[in-house]
């Protein structure tokens, strides 16, 4: 019996990494309900248009009495911020300041086709 060789295939992800760079702000005012996200492999504001309306999730570990569990904060990408592939996202609950610099997941659904 011949043995067939299968090449290892990387698992398919239904999300893209995004770095939480900070809150949208002006000189004196910080809008803590608007988060700035730098999307992976997105370098122009035209590329950000594909991600408008996509869901974003911040996953963190919350402490409880017996161990810990994962918790999430969901949001949605609204528009581009500047010309370099940064997007503005709004969340159901504001992201904590400790999340600045952490990686969020941008889900590739819903599809706006």
From Swiss-Prot:
InterPro entries: Ribosomal_eL33 (IPR001780), Ribosomal_eL33_sf (IPR038661), Transl_B-barrel_sf (IPR009000). GO terms for cellular component: ribonucleoprotein complex; ribosome. GO terms for molecular function: structural constituent of ribosome; tRNA binding. Signal peptide: none annotated. Keywords: Ribonucleoprotein, Ribosomal protein, RNA-binding, tRNA-binding. The keyword Transmembrane helix does not apply. GO terms for biological process: translation. The keyword Endoplasmic reticulum does not apply. HAMAP family: Ribosomal_eL33. Belongs to the eukaryotic ribosomal protein eL33 family. This is Large ribosomal subunit protein eL33. The gene is RPL35A.
